[in-house]
Amino acid sequence: MSLEDDVKLIIVDQLGVDASEVNENSSFIEDLNADSLDLTELIMTLEEKFDFEISEQDAEKLRTVGDVITYIKTRQGE
């Protein structure tokens, strides 16, 4: 399974949205109706899955599904 698929599955599971609603341009707040608690739980799940910590400053910049995928790819390339 690709990184993109992994991230999308986590988002579908955490936010309880339909997979068809999740694409790289989906905004967590505007398109997927996530609130701040949802986003905090999502960040925690991503940290656990990919085994690194996401700083609060970085987390605030992750507004779309694509932002998360790009961030993880960058972190994995370190």
Curated annotation (Swiss-Prot):
It is found in: Cytoplasm. GO terms for biological process: lipid A biosynthetic process. InterPro entries: ACP (IPR003231), ACP-like_sf (IPR036736), PP-bd_ACP (IPR009081), Ppantetheine_attach_site (IPR006162). 4'-phosphopantetheine is transferred from CoA to a specific serine of apo-ACP by AcpS. This modification is essential for activity because fatty acids are bound in thioester linkage to the sulfhydryl of the prosthetic group. Keywords: Cytoplasm, Fatty acid biosynthesis, Fatty acid metabolism, Lipid biosynthesis, Lipid metabolism, Phosphopantetheine, Phosphoprotein. GO terms for molecular function: acyl binding; acyl carrier activity. GO terms for cellular component: cytosol; membrane. Residues 1-76 form the Carrier domain. Signal peptide: none annotated. Pathway: Lipid metabolism; fatty acid biosynthesis. Belongs to the acyl carrier protein (ACP) family. This is Acyl carrier protein. It comes from Chlamydia felis (strain Fe/C-56).
